[in-house]
Amino acid sequence: MVHLSAEEKEAVLGLWGKVNVDEVGGEALGRLLVVYPWTQRFFESFGDLSNADAVMGNPKVKAHGKKVLQSFSDGLKHLDNLKGTFAKLSELHCDQLHVDPENFRLLGNVIVVVLARRLGHDFNPNVQAAFQKVVAGVANALAHKYH
């Protein structure tokens, strides 16, 4: 559960309507893989991840990033039940993929960076604070199975 004021929730959901999930998802996952290269081990089947240009132009990275951000978008519809919304993904990432739950926090922070870059002045400090709450809540929900 994410505790947002009415103003924060309005800002998050309002700005989310301006987000191109396809583009932001690919950029966010790509940046995660470049900035935190140890995360690439989960994506060895994606082909060439040898440098930033290869990662950012990789169609499999873009496609999976889109899928990730679509799930994040679904979570925004269920801010009061993030653990329930992400329960199956938490189980998958814990039991089958063995992803370090710290990676969820890292991805959340990268999503915030990409949103700030793309939304410019609309992504003011108050909006950033609200989004940080949301990505922290999603990361916590995804890590829930690990506890």
From Swiss-Prot:
The modification N6-acetyllysine is found at residues 60, 83, 145. Red blood cells. Signal peptide: none annotated. Pfam families: Globin. SUPFAM superfamilies: Globin-like (SSF46458). Keywords: Acetylation, Heme, Iron, Metal-binding, Oxygen transport, Phosphoprotein, S-nitrosylation, Transport. The modification Phosphoserine is found at residue 45. One of its GO terms (molecular function) is hemoglobin alpha binding. The modification S-nitrosocysteine is found at residue 94. The modification N-acetylvaline is found at residue 2. CDD domains: Hb-beta-like. GO terms for cellular component: haptoglobin-hemoglobin complex; hemoglobin complex. Heme b binds at residues 64, 93. The keyword Phosphoprotein applies. It comes from the Eukaryota. Belongs to the globin family. Involved in oxygen transport from the lung to the various peripheral tissues. Heterotetramer of two alpha chains and two beta chains. This is Hemoglobin subunit beta. The gene is HBB.
